[in-house]
A protein has these predicted regions:
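C-terminal transmembrane helical hairpin of 12-TM major facilitator-type secondary transporters
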Residues: 330-373
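C-terminal ends and interior cores of transmembrane alpha-helices
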Residues: 91-117, 339-351
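Helix-loop boundary and gating motifs at the non-cytosolic
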Residues: 5-63, 258, 262, 266-290
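Loop-to-transmembrane helix entry/capping segments in MFS-fold secondary transporters
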Residues: 50-51, 152-162, 382-394
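Intracellular loop-helix junctions on the cytosolic face of multi-pass helical membrane proteins
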Residues: 1-15, 109, 114-129, 137-138, ...
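Helix-to-loop junctions at the C-terminal end of transmembrane segments
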Residues: 66-83, 316-329, 413
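Intracellular juxtamembrane helix-capping segments at the cytosolic ends
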Residues: 137-150, 369-383
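A late C-terminal transmembrane helix in Major Facilitator Superfamily
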Residues: 384-416
Length: 447
């Protein structure tokens, strides 16, 4: 690390250090994407009614809404050097729990509960809840460490690399079921049981989570409280003061709220992508709504490929966005979301599985923008005081839209004819509103 300081006092880090700070995000995102891309398939396979899928998809955002501000608040006040420092102890805890749950979740249909039984669905729901909780505990430290350790000049690059690694993990997660099927692992199973191709994918994802998280924990040395206070220009005791979340929100910079508006539309749209993709593809391309059929499972595998395409596009685009100068952030952000809106809407019209590759690539461009710019803009506007708490609270801009979308689906889904395909046209319109909302953002930098 260099001792050269920027206007905020933080030193300029080597690119290798920025990569090391973010490396564990590869494994965390692999776990998260396996859950989000396969959850609809798993629950419909064990007998969940498609009309009730919204209830299961309430669990991830609820977990994030509750857990991430708590992790932010407590990690602001934590210093445990033997466990890594300030944020890393929480990464360790989240990783341990997530690995255990990743082994249990794909086996939801293998414990003899019975197809469509309340016990099977409750087991799956509780397992997902724990995976969500642990994933959020493991995910938040990476976002906070960039805010803690990276200066304004490098922050866009750092979050761009985080997005790059995040999407690389998503690529791996998305192709695992397809890859293992290609290698001869069974992609079908008896009624109510999740295929082995999905089970093995979760096992491999768990191993990757352990390896990458350990890499970050062993390679990164967080700033001790005195050094942190010096670099951020605050008093060492500032982060120990117990200001309420409401008080902090009242004093949040304007950029916090304008980015939150954009986030609402973006995450609302993506909630429907995760909830309805497998069913929409099965309906539009394979012409089936029978979740136990081989055709439906083939559609589920193809969604895995499309999710990989989405993530590959996001990998490439996030690396491009990492190079965009600060003065063009809004153009890159709004343009990415506009392209994504086109991709969402196109899924409604497409009946060819290969044309869907283009649709999901466009969606991936929006995903890259969503994972690069919001945290860059918000952390640039924040001082070092209560950094973790603010980022935990900002996670509400991700979680609340998903909760609203899931609850709204109980009215919107029947209103749109009970068609999972129709939900994508709605998602495209909502994403367009997100792109237009970027014009409300005015970037500020702490001096």
């Amino acid at each position: 690390m260099s001792s050269q300081k920027t206007t905020t006092g933080l030193p300029t880090l080597s690119k290798s250090m920025i990569w090391m700070i973010n490396f564990g995000f590869l494994g965390v995102q692999t776990a998260f994407t396996l859950q989000s891309s396969q959850m609809s398939r798993i629950f419909q396979t064990i007998g969940a009614d498609p009309n009730n899928l919204g209830w299961f998809f309430l669990l991830p955002p609820l977990a994030g809404l509750i857990v991430q501000p708590i992790i932010g608040t407590y990690s602001d006040r934590t210093w445990a050097p033997k466990l890594g420092g300030r944020r890393l102890p929480y990464l360790l805890l989240g990783t341990i729990v997530a690995v255990i749950v990743m082994i249990l979740l794909p086996n939801s249909g293998s414990f003899g509960f019975g197809y469509g039984s309340l016990a099977a669905l409750w087991f799956g729901a509780i397992t997902v809840a724990f995976l969500d909780l642990s994933s959020n505990v493991a995910m938040q430290p990476f976002k906070m460490m960039v805010g803690d350790m990276v200066n304004d000049d490098q922050k866009s690059y750092a979050y761009g690399i985080q997005s790059f690694l995040s999407n690389t993990g998503a690529v791996l997660a998305a192709i695992f079921p397809f890859l293992f099927t290609f290698l001869g692992v069974a992609n079908t199973a008896k009624k109510g049981v999740v295929p082995q191709s999905v089970v093995v994918a979760f096992y491999v994802g768990a191993a990757l989570l352990v390896i990458t998280s350990l890499f970050t924990m062993l390679k990164v040395k967080e700033y001790d409280p005195a050094t942190y206070a010096l670099y951020h220009g605050i008093e060492e005791a500032d982060n120990q003061k117990g200001e309420s979340w409401l008080t902090l929100l009242k004093h949040a910079p304007k950029a916090f709220w304008t980015v939150t508006l954009v986030q609402f539309f973006c995450w609302f749209a993506f909630q429907y992508l995760w909830t309805y993709s497998a069913g929409a593809i099965a309906q539009n391309v394979w012409h089936t709504t029978n979740a136990t059929s081989a055709a439906y499972q083939a559609a589920g595998n193809w969604y895995g490929v499309l999710a990989a395409v989405q993530s590959i596009a996001a990998v490439v685009w996030s690396y491009v966005l990492a190079k965009v100068p600060n003065q063009y952030h809004k153009l890159g952000y709004g343009g990415s979301l506009l392209i994504g809106a086109t991709g969402f809407a196109s899924i409604f019209f497409v009946h060819n599985q290969y044309v869907l590759i283009l649709s999901y690539a466009l969606v991936g461009i929006a995903w890259a923008g969503m994972n690069t710019y919001p945290l860059t803009i918000v952390t640039n506007a924040l001082t070092g005081k209560h950094m973790g708490t603010y980022l935990g609270l900002f996670n509400g801009s991700i979680c609340l839209p998903q909760i609203v979308a899931s609850l709204a689906s109980f009215a919107l889904f029947p209103m749109l004819g009970g068609s999972q395909v129709n939900m994508f046209l709605l998602a495209g319109i909502v994403m367009l509103l997100g792109a237009l909302s970027v014009t409300t953002i005015k970037e500020t930098y702490v001096k």
